[in-house]
């Protein structure tokens, strides 16, 4: 037997052993492939295409029960309300089971909102003159939601506290609002906001970025 044949046989044997051990490779998400439904619990799948930023998947149950064990969506822009200043942006990212938010876009990385009562301004009723929504009700995308609401802090360029930022969880409409200690001005924008780190664990299925883009969430 030639060396080439020996190596080919060895390669085939190793591939068979890897497959038997539950490690598979392919292109695309396994949770969208009917042919993967019958794979045993504990199977590990590597997506060579890194679809939606997910690299490694673990089969956790029967059918299409898969969990991403290594993945990163990268920063994705989130649809915002018109309460934001024109230069401001909101981005979201999921790494593994942790969701991160970023608020900035302005000069020196500041975040800002428009004046109270301005065109498109979206007030938040329970905050009165002191708050507005920056991500609309239902605006947090699937795959990035939290069952529990989260509260962070806002600062005037890091010097003093402006107020709080509130992220409503699945039990409270999946939106984000900001609330200030003082009334939001009616004659000028507030452009020098710094927002504290806002992140949390999620147990939602891995997001489908193409679907979210088509739906206008990102």
Predicted regions and their residues:
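Extracellular/surface-exposed low-complexity repeats and stalk/linker segments enriched in Gly/Pro
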Residues: 3-51
């Amino acid at each position: 037997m030639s060396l080439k044949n020996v190596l080919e046989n060895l390669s085939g044997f190793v591939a068979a052993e890897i497959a038997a051990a539950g490690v598979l490779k392919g292109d695309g998400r396994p949770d969208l492939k009917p042919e993967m439904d019958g794979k045993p619990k504990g199977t590990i799948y590597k997506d060579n295409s890194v679809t939606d930023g997910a690299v490694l998947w673990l089969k956790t149950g029967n059918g299409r029960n898969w969990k991403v064990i290594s993945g990163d969506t990268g920063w994705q822009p989130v649809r915002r309300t018109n309460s934001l200043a024109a230069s401001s942006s909101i981005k979201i990212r999921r790494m593994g089971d942790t969701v991160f938010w970023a608020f900035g876009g302005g000069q020196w990385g500041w975040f800002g909102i428009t004046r109270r009562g301005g065109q498109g301004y979206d007030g938040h009723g329970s905050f009165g003159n002191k708050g507005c929504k920056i991500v609309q009700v239902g605006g947090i995308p699937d795959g990035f939601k939290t069952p529990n609401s989260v509260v962070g802090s806002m600062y005037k360029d890091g010097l003093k506290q402006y107020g709080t930022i509130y992220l409503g969880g699945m039990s409270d409409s999946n939106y984000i609002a900001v609330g200030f200690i003082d009334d939001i001005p009616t004659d000028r924008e507030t452009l020098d906001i710094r927002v504290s780190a806002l992140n949390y664990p999620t147990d939602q299925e891995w997001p489908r970025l193409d679907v979210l883009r088509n739906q206008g969430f990102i």
